[in-house]
């Protein structure tokens, strides 16, 4: 996601720490309840996270091939066309809109696991000169302009994006108080059309039909639809009510509570349960 490249360093830090501490990591391994019981663990920490909420069965046409979750888009599993509708204007919806309109976004399928261990690798980020042009910050040191600001360069977005939410009111009102204005400014300057109070009627090969906040039926002619309508906890590994497993189970992170999940809360959950054990 543009602007979040620094989080890569956090991931790389944990990978190196796990290796340094001798933690055994098993990838591409399907885990089930029987495997956990057979292993005779004393504690099992379920940090299985979340999956994007699907609209299949809830919205006509949600199973069409041009419809995808934000995870499918960002992983590179699916790609979008030149016109895109984003369903959901929470934090993820804004992130996806920025990713779709910025020139320096990079899908995860371009990042092999070997790059995470390469100390010289850094995600492709916006250059300083590009940042100055976008935000109208002059590089002159004589401060001939007020506040060192000039008129920003006109931005030609790489695709047309519609960002929609069901509730009425300003989009992005629930974003972070210190940086939310940056995200709102980005989508505005990149020509993202913001739609509030939308009722999603159906998705067809023509695009997505909505009822706008004035009660009028409207067709948004888009090539692709990205669903950012929240996420759901993955808890299949937790014991059922009445089970008596040998291990003590702990549920943390998004698996514990999917709503409003962020990295800070997930890391804190992990630290607290580890300290308790």
Identify the residue ranges that each predicted region occupies.
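N-terminal Rossmann-like dinucleotide/flavin-binding domain of flavoprotein oxidoreductases
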Residues: 1-41, 172-198
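Short acidic, glycine/proline-rich loop/turn micro-motifs
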Residues: 1, 58-59
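Short catalytic/ligand-gating loop segments at beta-alpha or beta-beta junctions
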Residues: 197-205
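Rossmann-like dinucleotide/flavin-binding elements
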Residues: 26-37, 47-57, 63-175, 203, ...
């Amino acid at each position: 996601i543009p602007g979040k490249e620094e989080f890569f360093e956090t991931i790389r830090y944990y990978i190196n720490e796990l290796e340094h501490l001798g933690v055994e990591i098993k990838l591409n391994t399907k885990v089930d309840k029987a495997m956990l019981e057979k292993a005779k663990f004393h504690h099992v920490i379920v940090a299985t996270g979340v999956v994007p909420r699907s609209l299949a069965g809830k919205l006509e046409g949600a199973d069409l091939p041009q419809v995808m979750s934000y995870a499918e888009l960002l992983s590179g599993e699916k790609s979008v066309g030149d016109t895109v509708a984003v369903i959901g204007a929470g934090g993820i919806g804004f992130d996806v809109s920025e990713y779709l309109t910025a020139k320096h976004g990079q899908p995860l399928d371009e990042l092999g696991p070997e790059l995470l261990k390469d100390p010289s690798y850094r995600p492709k980020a916006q250059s300083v000169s590009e940042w100055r042009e976008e935000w109208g910050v002059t590089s002159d040191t004589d401060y001939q302009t007020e506040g060192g600001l000039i008129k920003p360069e006109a931005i030609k977005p790489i695709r047309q994006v519609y960002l929609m939410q069901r509730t009425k009111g300003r989009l992005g009102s629930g974003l972070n108080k210190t940086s939310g204005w940056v995200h709102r400014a980005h989508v505005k300057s990149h020509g993202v059309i913001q739609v509030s109070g939308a009722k999603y009627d159906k998705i067809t090969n023509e695009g997505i039909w909505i009822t706008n906040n004035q009660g009028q039926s409207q067709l948004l002619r888009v090539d692709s639809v990205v669903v950012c309508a929240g996420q759901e906890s993955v808890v299949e590994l937790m014991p059922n009510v009445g089970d008596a497993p040998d291990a003590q189970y702990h549920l943390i992170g998004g698996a514990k509570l999917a709503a409003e999940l962020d990295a800070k809360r997930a890391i804190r959950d992990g630290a607290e349960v580890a300290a308790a054990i």
